A protein has these predicted regions:
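Hydrophobic ligand-binding cavity/cleft-lining segments
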Residues: 2-69, 77, 161, 165-172
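Intrinsic-disorder/low-complexity, polar/charged segments enriched in Ser/Thr/Lys/Arg/Asp/Glu/Gln
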Residues: 27-33, 69, 83, 96, ...
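Short strand-connecting beta-turns/loops that link adjacent beta-strands
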Residues: 39, 93, 118-122
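Short beta-strand segments that buttress and anchor functional surface loops
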Residues: 71-77, 97-104
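Short, cysteine-centered beta-strand-loop-beta hairpins and adjacent loop/turn segments enriched
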Residues: 76-82, 134-139
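Beta-strand/loop substructures that line and gate deep hydrophobic ligand-binding cavities in soluble
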Residues: 100-157, 164
């Protein structure tokens, strides 16, 4: 937990080792970002509505929030959904959303999404920092394989999808 707390508190805009380091003890860490040509509050509100997550993160199934606890599922081995249950630990409108998994979650995870005005009035910088500890056994092996090659986190495909979705919606008459 010490590494996770330090990770959560750290400003990982420029992670150690120039961003090459992807492990902190048992924790695996991904940092991705994108610029969305929409106002910061609009991008924040869209992300904050957890039912929107499956629209741009294709490995996330239906998600809902009750009293600051988000329950959802991610694709698991053999089409089996894996429960992710996380408590919101920070919700600063227009700035940051942060979470940490509960003991009931099948995957130990924590992370944050930051929203900043992009330079030159170009919209919003979105930065997602996700840390997780793969569980032991078959599920853990599957998660390690998936996240090692998963373009949703590694290549920022989910954020690119968010960008396209929000910018297209804004362009519609």
């Amino acid at each position: 937990w010490r590494a996770a707390r330090a990770l959560h508190a750290a400003d990982l805009r420029h992670p150690p080792d120039g961003g090459r380091r992807r492990r902190y003890g048992d924790w695996r860490v991904e940092v991705v970002g994108a610029v969305v040509d929409r106002p910061r509050d609009e991008v924040y509100r869209f992300w904050r509505e957890v039912s929107n997550l499956p629209l741009f993160l294709d490995h996330v199934g239906a998600a809902h929030e009750i009293d600051g606890v988000v329950r959802g599922a991610v694709d698991g081995p053999g089409e089996r959904p894996v429960a992710v249950i996380a408590r919101l630990v920070s919700d600063r409108p227009g700035e940051e959303i942060a979470w940490a998994s509960t003991e009931a979650s099948e995957v130990e995870t924590r992370g944050k999404v930051r929203f900043r005005d992009a330079p030159g009035g170009r919209g919003t910088e979105v930065e997602a920092i996700v840390a997780y500890i793969p569980p032991p056994g078959r599920l853990g092996a599957w998660i390690r394989r998936r996240f090692r090659r998963d373009p949703d986190l590694r290549g920022g495909r989910g954020l690119r999808r968010l960008k396209r979705l929000m910018e297209r919606e804004a362009a519609r008459p």
